[in-house]
């Protein structure tokens, strides 16, 4: 600080700091309560309840920030507090965090509140936490000894099978398991298939995070196996095989598999963490190289992830010299997109005006992005970070980009000395646009890209998402080869769409016409027409018809819509179906299959399953 207070003499400074910390503590209680409630909903197989819980939790943070801002304005006239007192407020707040279990998240909450009250000129480390002040290393859990951040198990004493069974039962889930002994045997077989027979080192042990990770219809056990110098990650998804009966679905043993389930294209996990930094540290050991910002985001602390990401961006800018440029690919009608080649993200701004045929507004587009944020993304829609008042050095902006910004988004930019301040933007992970992937790829790439594209849209359909504009340029290919949707301005709920077949032409003139000879309502969709803009390349057509010939059949789209209108939720697996135990080791499931067959033969079986 330029004028570091020698004496913290302001009572108002302490009171404001205390009020802000109480606001954060209320937020984090609600955050943890949601994760605790997720366990009950999972046990009850209340999937709609879990979806609502996840949606409500996303909006909870901003609601707590607004509550705190209003309280500070009403009680302390916060906008008129002078600079010296604001500096003392931060120092008092630091003092209050010295024994806190979530100091890094509390610092971010402080920033969120201050940014609502203070002018942008105050966004420096004198007044807010541009850099962290409290270390998060070695924070101990305050829970009872029965629930540390992670538990350590030593299989040498009781054997691996008994240890694995104890790991599962320690989570004390209420529904019984269909056959836990069988499932544990599958885990052991999968470990042997992956690593062969290995000698147990003296330090052979298994570490398991004490809370389950809930998302969709699964609860994940997350841990690591340590043997000598080796550290092996694992994740075990638990699922209901039928109402009220659980099973271990598979075991994921590869880093890449874990990176996918913690990907930016999936919804956030519901997980109870008293010391979130300890969870993030643990997860970092099993997904080495994954930024902490992304890990915080994946466990539901998206504001902390957003804060860390911005710090990473500032750090990168100070240690790089390349320029921001217009993103390669076809320019969008609605968004201006630019990137920094040395930084794996894109920056997206909503244009001031849109040419025909686009009929939308900036407010409507923002609402579409919020819809995606709240919705279950299923690994098929990119998450976005939303920022306001981002200052970028003018010297790092390519001249062509500056001209494009001044032409397309003059209302969003403002020059401030050596910086260009952007009033609003979205930031996403950079991917290879699918149109470029197909254009530059060989036959194998095209087959993979088209198969993934069709799978992505079919999964989005099942999640009640109609992408709207399905051109290949609106999809990207991740570094793991998955196709992900990232253009949201025309997105709709499938249940709001009217699926129609193209009426037969009335005469030869209709048949030769380049315009529709039938009426088209604002929510009408015609799957039969999609081939016109998707199948121009013969290689693409061949792959499309091989893997997704039903894509252009209105019956497929209507069937998914009908299931959604009945309240049915499809099963989704963020891993290849071939690794599921029931597919990988079918011989171990023969008894279960026989029992299921007998149940179906019983007169009341079908009715009870449907009712459930």
Swiss-Prot record:
<keyword id="KW-0547">Nucleotide-binding</keyword>
<feature type="region of interest" description="Disordered">
    <location>
        <begin position="593"/>
        <end position="612"/>
    </location>
</feature>
<dbReference type="GO" id="GO:0006099">
    <property type="term" value="P:tricarboxylic acid cycle"/>
</dbReference>
<dbReference type="InterPro" id="IPR010452">
    <property type="entry name" value="Isocitrate_DH_AceK"/>
</dbReference>
<keyword id="KW-0418">Kinase</keyword>
<keyword id="KW-0067">ATP-binding</keyword>
<keyword id="KW-0904">Protein phosphatase</keyword>
<keyword id="KW-0723">Serine/threonine-protein kinase</keyword>
<keyword id="KW-0329">Glyoxylate bypass</keyword>
<keyword id="KW-0816">Tricarboxylic acid cycle</keyword>
<dbReference type="GO" id="GO:0004721">
    <property type="term" value="F:phosphoprotein phosphatase activity"/>
</dbReference>
<dbReference type="GO" id="GO:0004674">
    <property type="term" value="F:protein serine/threonine kinase activity"/>
</dbReference>
<keyword id="KW-0808">Transferase</keyword>
<feature type="binding site">
    <location>
        <begin position="327"/>
        <end position="333"/>
    </location>
    <ligand>
        <name>ATP</name>
    </ligand>
</feature>
<feature type="binding site">
    <location>
        <position position="348"/>
    </location>
    <ligand>
        <name>ATP</name>
    </ligand>
</feature>
<comment type="similarity">
    <text>Belongs to the AceK family.</text>
</comment>
<keyword id="KW-0963">Cytoplasm</keyword>
<dbReference type="GO" id="GO:0005737">
    <property type="term" value="C:cytoplasm"/>
</dbReference>
<dbReference type="GO" id="GO:0006006">
    <property type="term" value="P:glucose metabolic process"/>
</dbReference>
<dbReference type="GO" id="GO:0005524">
    <property type="term" value="F:ATP binding"/>
</dbReference>
<dbReference type="GO" id="GO:0008772">
    <property type="term" value="F:[isocitrate dehydrogenase (NADP+)] kinase activity"/>
</dbReference>
<dbReference type="InterPro" id="IPR046854">
    <property type="entry name" value="AceK_regulatory"/>
</dbReference>
<protein>
    <recommendedName>
        <fullName>Isocitrate dehydrogenase kinase/phosphatase</fullName>
        <ecNumber>2.7.11.5</ecNumber>
        <ecNumber>3.1.3.-</ecNumber>
    </recommendedName>
</protein>
<dbReference type="Pfam" id="PF20423">
    <property type="entry name" value="AceK_regulatory"/>
</dbReference>
<keyword id="KW-0378">Hydrolase</keyword>
<comment type="function">
    <text>Bifunctional enzyme which can phosphorylate or dephosphorylate isocitrate dehydrogenase (IDH) on a specific serine residue. This is a regulatory mechanism which enables bacteria to bypass the Krebs cycle via the glyoxylate shunt in response to the source of carbon. When bacteria are grown on glucose, IDH is fully active and unphosphorylated, but when grown on acetate or ethanol, the activity of IDH declines drastically concomitant with its phosphorylation.</text>
</comment>
<feature type="active site">
    <location>
        <position position="383"/>
    </location>
</feature>
<dbReference type="GO" id="GO:0016208">
    <property type="term" value="F:AMP binding"/>
</dbReference>
<dbReference type="InterPro" id="IPR046855">
    <property type="entry name" value="AceK_kinase"/>
</dbReference>
<dbReference type="GO" id="GO:0006097">
    <property type="term" value="P:glyoxylate cycle"/>
</dbReference>
<dbReference type="Pfam" id="PF06315">
    <property type="entry name" value="AceK_kinase"/>
</dbReference>
């Amino acid at each position: 600080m330029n004028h570091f207070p020698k004496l913290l003499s302001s009572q108002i400074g302490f009171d404001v700091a205390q009020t802000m910390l109480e606001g954060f503590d209320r937020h984090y209680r609600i955050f943890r309560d949601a994760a605790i409630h997720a366990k009950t909903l999972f046990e009850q197989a209340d999937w709609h309840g879990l979806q609502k819980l996840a949606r409500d939790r996303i909006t909870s943070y901003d609601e707590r920030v607004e509550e705190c801002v209003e309280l500070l304005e009403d009680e302390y006239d916060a906008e008129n507090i002078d600079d010296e007192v604001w500096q003392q407020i931060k120092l008092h707040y630091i003092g209050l965090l010295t024994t806190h279990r979530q100091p890094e998240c509390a610092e971010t909450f402080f920033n969120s509140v201050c940014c609502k009250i203070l002018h942008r000129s105050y966004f420096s480390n004198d007044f807010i936490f541009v850099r962290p002040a409290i270390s998060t290393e070695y924070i101990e859990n305050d829970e009872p000894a029965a629930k540390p951040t992670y538990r350590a198990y030593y299989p040498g004493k009781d054997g691996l099978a008994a240890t694995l069974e104890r790991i599962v039962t320690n989570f004390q889930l209420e529904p019984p398991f269909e056959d836990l002994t069988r499932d544990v045997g599958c885990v052991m077989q999968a470990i042997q298939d992956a690593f062969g027979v290995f000698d147990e080192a003296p330090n052979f042990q298994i570490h398991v995070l004490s809370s389950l990770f809930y998302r969709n219809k699964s609860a994940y056990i997350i841990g690591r196996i340590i043997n000598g110098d080796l550290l092996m990650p694992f994740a075990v998804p638990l699922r209901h095989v039928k109402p009220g009966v659980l099973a271990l679905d598979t075991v994921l043993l590869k880093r890449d598999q874990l990176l996918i389930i913690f990907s930016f294209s999936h919804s956030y996990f519901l997980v109870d963490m008293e010391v979130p930094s300890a969870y993030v540290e643990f997860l970092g050991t099993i997904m080495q190289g994954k930024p902490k910002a992304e890990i915080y985001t994946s466990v539901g602390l998206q504001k902390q992830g957003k804060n860390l990401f911005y710090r990473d961006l500032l750090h990168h800018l100070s240690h790089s010299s390349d320029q921001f440029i217009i993103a390669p690919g076809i320019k969008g009608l609605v968004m201006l997109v630019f990137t920094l080649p040395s930084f794996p993200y894109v920056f997206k701004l909503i244009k001031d005006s849109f040419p025909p045929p686009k009929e939308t507004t900036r407010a409507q587009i923002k609402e579409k992005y919020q819809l995606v944020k709240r919705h279950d993304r299923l690994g098929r829609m990119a998450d976005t970070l939303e920022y306001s008042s981002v200052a970028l050095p003018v010297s790092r902006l390519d001249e062509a980009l500056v001209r494009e910004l001044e032409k397309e988004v003059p209302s969003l930019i403002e020059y401030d000395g050596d910086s260009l301040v952007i009033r609003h933007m979205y930031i996403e992970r950079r991917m290879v646009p699918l149109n470029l992937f197909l254009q530059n790829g060989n036959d194998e790439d095209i087959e993979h890209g088209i198969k993934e594209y069709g799978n992505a849209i079919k999964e989005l359909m099942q999640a009640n998402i109609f992408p709207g504009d399905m051109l290949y340029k609106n999809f990207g290919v991740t570094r793991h080869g998955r196709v992900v949707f990232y253009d949201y301005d025309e997105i709709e709920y499938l249940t709001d769409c009217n699926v129609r077949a193209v009426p037969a032409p009335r005469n030869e003139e209709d048949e030769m016409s380049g315009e529709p000879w039938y009426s088209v309502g604002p929510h009408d969709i015609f799957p039969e027409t999609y081939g016109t803009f998707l199948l121009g390349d013969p290689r693409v057509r061949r792959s499309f018809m091989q893997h997704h010939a039903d894509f252009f059949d209105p019956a497929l789209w209507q069937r998914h819509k009908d299931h959604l209108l009945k309240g049915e939720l499809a099963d989704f697996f963020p891993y290849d179906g071939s690794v599921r135990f029931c597919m990988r080791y079918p011989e171990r499931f023969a008894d279960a299959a026989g029992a299921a067959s007998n149940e179906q033969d019983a007169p009341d079986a079908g009715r009870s399953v449907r009712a459930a």
